[in-house]
């Protein structure tokens, strides 16, 4: 990765993140704290970064103070932790500002935690996102040594989902003037959930099915080296079908085993723990 490419990306990202159209979420962040946004894939972690950038610019910061870097950019080759310092050096050659770091999907860089800890120790303001099993909140809190606030990002609440569909639930008389639309959207919300990208999708099921596969194979099976992935898949389906009634671990193991794939109660306990 060349110095010219990094500088080009830094400049492109500054233009992009300062112009993103946002649906503000009900999130309050404390000034001058460092954050790691973790959570489900496509829950809106990057957009929380963009929202924070918009707030900083509204407060008077220049876009040139923003050092946003997307580590999923296909123009970037595989990076090592030393490349993170190289990115910082390139920024410092471009500007005299002290940068505010926004590092998107940085878990793709091996041993990135060392760089993140050092930035915090040097009193930089830093925001980080990560969406796969390498970024479990319990482990990240330990790895980063208390230098960052771990913020769990969830899909839209119903209120946010309505806002994304141009309905302000706090507006006067909206429950009467938009009653039919609110009921319709609430039904869609409870059918498909509140992942931001599903808003406006005519048929979100196929997209959500692909997302499930990424989470299932990329996060659960790969991380925990689950050999009996069929049993895990059956267990997830049966639990979803039984969402209205409680299930014991023994019952879960029995249901899965009845399909022909034996699952012990201990394994059921482990699998549920992996999903939590």
Model-derived regions, located:
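Conserved lysine of the Walker
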Residues: 45-46
């Amino acid at each position: 990765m060349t110095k010219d490419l990094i500088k080009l990306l830094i400049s492109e990202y500054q233009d992009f993140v300062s112009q993103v159209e946002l649906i503000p979420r009900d999130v309050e962040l404390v000034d001058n704290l460092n954050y790691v946004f973790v959570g489900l894939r496509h829950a809106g972690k990057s957009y929380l970064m963009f929202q924070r950038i918009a707030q900083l610019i509204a407060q008077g910061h220049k876009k040139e103070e923003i050092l946003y870097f997307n580590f999923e950019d296909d123009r970037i080759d595989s990076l090592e932790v030393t490349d993170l310092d190289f990115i910082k050096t390139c920024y410092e050659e471009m500007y005299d500002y002290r940068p505010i770091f926004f590092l998107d999907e940085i878990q793709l860089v091996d041993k990135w935690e060392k760089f993140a800890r050092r930035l915090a120790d040097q009193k930089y303001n830093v925001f980080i996102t990560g969406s796969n099993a390498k970024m479990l909140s319990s482990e990240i809190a330990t790895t980063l040594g208390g230098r960052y606030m771990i913020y769990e990002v969830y899909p839209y609440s119903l209120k946010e989902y309505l806002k994304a569909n141009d309905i302000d639930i706090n507006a006067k008389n909206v429950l009467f003037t938009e009653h039919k639309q609110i009921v319709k959207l609430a039904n869609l919300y409870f059918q498909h959930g509140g992942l931001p990208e599903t808003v406006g999708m005519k048929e979100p099921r196929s997209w959500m099915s692909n997302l499930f596969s990424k989470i299932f194979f990329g996060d659960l099976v790969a991380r925990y080296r689950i050999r009996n992935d069929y049993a895990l898949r059956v267990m997830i389906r049966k639990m979803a079908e039984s969402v209205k009634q409680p299930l014991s671990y023994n019952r879960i193991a029995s249901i899965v085993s009845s399909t022909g794939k034996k699952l012990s109660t201990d394994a059921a306990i482990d699998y549920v723990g992996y999903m939590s």
